[in-house]
Amino acid sequence: MVRPRRVFAQHWLKSEKALDAIVKAAECSTNDRILEIGPGTGILTRRLLPLVEALLAVEIDRDLCKLLVKQLGQKENFLLLQGDFLTLDLVANLLTFPKFQKPNKVVANIPYNITGPIIEKLLGTIANPNPEPFDSIVLLIQKEVAERLYAKAGSRTFGALSVRVQYLADCEFICDVPAGAFHPPPKVDSAVVRLRPRQIQIPARDPKRLENLVKLGFGAKRKMLRNNLQSVVDRDRLSQLLEQLNINPQARAEDISTQQWVELANLLGVE
């Protein structure tokens, strides 16, 4: 057995209950092509393979790649790419593997220290969304980050990440996963979430403006929004716009829903 390596933030999932929850949330069918990021020892991979048409796994650890090839390399619906998912060009690497091209779902237990960059690569950004969105993305991530993904406006966990992700996808909590479900146990609890990329109901007229507005608005979270945005709009004018949207002029960034952020950006766009 390959030992978990701290440099890659590795923790082996061992809970059958958590694995059951992940597989159920993935809603796999025999037509699905799955992308798994960081398969580790393959405990989740082995659960998924009998259920899907194809599974593409991306693993950075060479020792784990050797283990996975030895154990699963003979499976016709399994393909392993060795490399860093954040920098790997999947399209180029899959040119000669048509069966594994354009995966439609993601199912993964990802390294917690790069959760944000991974989600951004999967979803894209407000200004540059993924042009070929996945049907669903099921992730096992740090609980604190999970809470920010599906947080509602007005809650203590609602922030810039909430807005950026919720603009592009519906976010759903699946289950909690305690630290004891892993070897070695991480210092934090975890959770399974499901993201479903969707068509934007009321899109921002200028997505880049919205992106910048959200960044500025959450720059100093405890301050009122009209203070955080005074570099782009006069305070009194912002108060008028907020009232027009039925938002308290003394609201803070976390009090404003994702849709209200879009509406505010659109109003500022016609100033």
Swiss-Prot record:
SMART domains, A to Z: rADc
Q: Which UniProt keywords apply?
A: Cytoplasm, Methyltransferase, RNA-binding, rRNA processing, S-adenosyl-L-methionine, Transferase
Recall the GO molecular function terms of this protein's record.
16S rRNA (adenine(1518)-N(6)/adenine(1519)-N(6))-dimethyltransferase activity; RNA binding
Any idea which positions bind S-adenosyl-L-methionine? 11, 13, 38, 59, 84, 109
Under the cellular component aspect of Gene Ontology, which terms does the record hold?
Answer: cytosol
**Methyltransferase in keyword set:** yes
Disulfide-bonded cysteine pairs: these are none
Cite the CDD domains for this sequence: AdoMet_MTases (cd02440)
Primary localisation category: cytoplasm
The catalytic activity of this protein is classed by the Enzyme Commission as 2.1.1.182
- Family from the record: Belongs to the class I-like SAM-binding methyltransferase superfamily. rRNA adenine N(6)-methyltransferase family. RsmA subfamily.
Describe the task this protein carries out.
Specifically dimethylates two adjacent adenosines (A1518 and A1519) in the loop of a conserved hairpin near the 3'-end of 16S rRNA in the 30S particle. May play a critical role in biogenesis of 30S subunits.
Protein's name in the database: Ribosomal RNA small subunit methyltransferase A
Per the UniProt record, the source organism is: Trichormus variabilis (strain ATCC 29413 / PCC 7937)
Q: Which gene encodes it?
A: rsmA
